[in-house]
Amino acid sequence: MLIEVERQDDVCVLRLQGRLVTGADPAYLLAKTDEIKSQNCDKVLADLRELLSIGSTGIGFLVGIYTSVTKSPGRRFVLVGPRRRVREVLDLTHLSSVIPVVSDIASGLAALRAEGPAAQSAGEGSSVL
């Protein structure tokens, strides 16, 4: 499991790679959560294209970041490009009906940069996968 955090202009990009499942190092996940929070980003894009599998630990990590990011008005979080197996877990847990899921980076950036409160809900639960 590898989680990279980088800032690209007004967006924090999280790149998740490998397997985010039970047994993942809790200290590592806490450190990454703190790193993301310290960036104080209003817009966060989680790139899941290289995430091979996700379990309850990974779902908990994503929910924690989502909750932290979106607790203030106007802040947005989007998931990008989950593989079929990861998408199935997002659907099974209904996380994909809460957090917008899009197929590619360009769509994710467009969703994050759209104006107004309707912009976030426009992608919620929808998918172009």
Region locations from a protein language model:
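Short beta-strand/loop segment at the start of cytosolic alpha/beta domains
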Residues: 1-15, 128
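General small-molecule cofactor/ligand-binding pocket signal
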Residues: 6, 80, 102
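Conserved catalytic submotifs in the C-terminal HATPase_c
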Residues: 8, 49, 106
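Active-site donor-binding loop signature of nucleotide-sugar glycosyltransferases
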Residues: 16-18, 104
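Amphipathic alpha-helical interaction surfaces in cytosolic regulatory modules
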Residues: 20-99
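A charged, well-structured terminal subsegment
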Residues: 100-129
